[in-house]
């Protein structure tokens, strides 16, 4: 819970400990942007993301992952969209760790946005939970710092519900037709209706021993990881050999992750859970 979209390739860093300011500056300089982009009006309240982050750190939230989009227009390098994944003190490590996903930019492409997510340590992969849990958006005006901190606690408050949903998915054994239906829907969402370069069977193939179970939660994670990380051998519409690409844009990551979560939730509801 990493990220091909219209924003292109990204700079990113993840550690199993809180990221330092030096690491953030090296990989995600837009976090430290010193002013709003020239295209923004006087009504735009400019607060560097690092100021927001330091306020969140005082509340016990620490960044473990950060990324920003690469841009062709170098004047936007310090204003481009970026993403931080934050964990609360006391929830820093574990098999599945809740994370607050913070999105922002200072070029007008994004307000402050916070989403609930889960980081799965065994595959170093992040999951974005669907919109059914809500999300927090804070526009760049007024008391931004206070509103973002309130938003972080609001997102923190939904993790009990996320865990309940995860437990329900883990308790549901999926029959083969349901597994195939979930994978087929995911393939069509990712690659379109006309041609899918890989098969349902490939998408359902586990990458490690821990993922051989056929409960809904594990099947969902297999599908998610195979789509997000790519690297699967396939065929183009013209029949040429190819490999699927990893999803490497912030918007693409969040959009696909949300859609997959909704598919898993719908499957859960279909079976009356």
What are these regions (language model features)?
Residues 1-12, 90-96, 102-273:
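Intrinsically disordered, low-complexity regions enriched in serine/threonine
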Residues 21, 27, 37, 79-82, ...:
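Histidine (H) residue identity feature
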């Amino acid at each position: 819970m990493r990220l091909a979209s219209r924003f292109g390739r990204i700079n990113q860093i993840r550690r199993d400990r809180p990221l330092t300011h030096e690491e953030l500056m090296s990989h995600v300089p837009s976090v430290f942007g010193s002013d709003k982009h020239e295209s923004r009006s006087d009504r735009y309240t400019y607060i560097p993301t690092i100021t927001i982050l330091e306020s969140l750190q005082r509340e016990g939230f620490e960044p473990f992952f950060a990324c920003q989009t690469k841009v062709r227009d170098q004047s936007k390098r310090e204003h481009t969209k970026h993403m931080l994944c934050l964990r609360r003190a006391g929830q820093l490590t574990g098999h599945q760790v809740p994370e607050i996903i913070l999105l922002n930019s200072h070029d007008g492409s994004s307000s402050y946005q916070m989403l609930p997510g889960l980081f799965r340590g065994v595959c170093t992969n992040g999951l974005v939970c669907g919109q059914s849990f809500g999300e927090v958006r804070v526009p760049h005006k007024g008391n931004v710092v206070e509103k973002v901190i309130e938003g972080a606690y609001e997102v923190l408050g939904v993790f009990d519900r996320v865990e309940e949903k995860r437990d329900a998915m883990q308790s549901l054994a999926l029959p083969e037709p349901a597994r195939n239906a979930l994978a087929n829907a995911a393939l069509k969402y990712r690659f379109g209706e006309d041609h899918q370069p890989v098969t349902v069977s490939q998408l359902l193939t586990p990458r490690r021993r821990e993922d051989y179970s056929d409960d809904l939660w594990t099947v969902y994670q297999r599908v998610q990881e195979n789509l997000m990380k790519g690297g699967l051998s396939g065929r183009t519409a013209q029949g040429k050999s190819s490999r699927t690409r990893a999803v490497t844009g912030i918007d693409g990551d969040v959009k696909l992750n949300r859609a997959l979560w909704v598919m898993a939730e719908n499957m859960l509801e279909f079976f009356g859970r």
